[in-house]
Amino acid sequence: MEPPKCPLLSVRDITKYFGGIRALDRVNLDVYEGEVVALLGDNGAGKSTLIKILAGAYQPDEGEIQLDGKTMLFRTPRDAMEGGIHTVFQELSLCDNLDVAANLFLGSELEKKVFNLVPWFDHFRMRQEATTLLHDLAVDIPRVDRRVRDLSGGQRQALAISKAVREKSRLLIMDEPTAALGVAQTRKVLDLVQSLKTRNLAIIYISHNLHDILEVSDRCVVLKNGRKAAELTTRESDKEELTSVILTGELTEARPNQSTR
């Protein structure tokens, strides 16, 4: 099926300097609803800088970000989240001392009135809704009253992703979501990523694991020295080609580049 004509996210000529260093040089990127775009590149390629700009942690020196064709200015991470962009970083923003439900609703807790006067957290309803959400997403966390510190790495990752879904994310940026996970836990996270596509979420997926990239992504965008080096349709590529482009920043002569705008 052809993607919609208007991308959910359009990044146009994004440039970022740190002193005299140009970390990003006129980078362009489109992401459509219901697709996974892999963002690839070696260390120092510019991936982290780009996702921090999209997350509102940095502001670009040049260029613009558009959502649904509307130019956006994210001065803070809160601005980005209010625009529907959520980022799940490697260092998960979870509170180990709180339970699963409390983490899902952290910052947007449901309340009830005691004696119709005093507002109080409605823990019962939050746990009910948390159970329903995790069930709908097929997330394997049997008890929502369990402390997060007692969860496995895969469960913690799934919880952070589920929190973004509950907060009505439209674009989810996932930074190394399977790093340090075992085989079984990785499988569950990849299955969750695939299921999010059916919910029409747009996903930017950053990983050094090319096996995962080839399985879950629709397109691959490769950065090299702060520039967009290549864009490929994943099903038409393979591990050897992606490795070569990441290292050299170039495609073979027989392989046309889709876009280096």
Give the predicted meaning of each segment.
Residues E2-R261:
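Glycine-rich phosphate-binding loops of nucleotide-dependent enzymes
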